[in-house]
Amino acid sequence: MKKVFLLPAILLLGISGIAQKWTKEYMHVNEIACGLSLVEKDGKHGYVNKEGKLIIPLIYDEGMNFVEGRAGVMVANKWGFIDSTGIEFVRPQYSEVYSFNEGMAAVAKGESWGFIDEKGNLIIPMNYTNARCFSGGLAPVCNSKGLWGYIDRQGKTVLAFQYGYADRFRDGTAKVMKSGKWIYIDPLGKVVKEGDE
């Protein structure tokens, strides 16, 4: 019986030893996401597979983990997006970006935020001063008065701009600040629980 358990243990140690060997080549190694891991070497970023093979060259100044098969990458202080083969489908042009979620990504030029689709088309105009990722079909956005509300995937305001801050929905609730207090709301804006901060 001991032989049966010994073989998997030897294989596991061998695999982890190989992984540790290639990770030492890099200053930083992120967790694997969508089959690829963001790595950094000599101030440049690229992506390796789980075996440590460089799939996307170390040519970026910064990078993000892959989400929904896409990753934000920065060149010369501008962000764009690549797919998991390294093909750039959004040229670096944005000052800030968030990862894709539900097929859309929040992007900024200067202080103006909007949303692009999976092809890089601007779907929701840059009418906001801040934004977060879509979740549950809604995204928190901030207007020019500094108030947060929620929009749907067509850019229609669903929950009015009334919050001092609004986070994305997680498990059907979102944390927002209203009248200086943290509360949790549902997608209809109903308070479901008082905040903890």
For every predicted segment, state its role.
Residues 1-21:
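Bacterial Sec-dependent N-terminal signal peptides
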